[in-house]
Amino acid sequence: MINRTSPEVRVPRLLVVHHTASPALRAMLEAVLAGARDPELAESGISVEVAPALAANATDVLAADGFVLGTPVNIGYMSGALKHFFDQVYYPCLGAKPGAPYGLYVHGDNNTTGAVRAVQSIATGMGWAEVVKPVTAVGPVGKDAERQCYDLGATVAANLALDRPARRIGTTDG
């Protein structure tokens, strides 16, 4: 008898790494997850994995195909927890996921510019492709920010569903 095994089908994996230190960030995270798990994307079979920034590691990054990152702004910078995540994964994962799509959401009480710039710089160094503009919220998180977070999660997941190289925003390559 011939043993016919079907080739293993690999499901695209979206890793959501977050530091959710406030109700505002919880609302943003929940909206991102709802977007990433949108019923229209469900048929693509994308696996959405969620990891707190202090628990996520290089193994998680190496197993993922795309990323959503969430952080509060602390003293004008990303949270120490997200920075710790990057410190842990940077060298083991450097260049391992070229072109992997990613998105970012940030919440602060005043200016989010420094945190956004820092995360973008590190993600660019990792070789990841920003496929949607960062969602930034200052002060209370309203319905508009939640909708933007939903769209962010759906956009990154849709890039994985397309099964082609991600296209960086603002470019025509890819």
Residue spans for each PLM region:
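N-terminal beta1-alpha1 ligand-phosphate binding loop
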Residues: 2-40
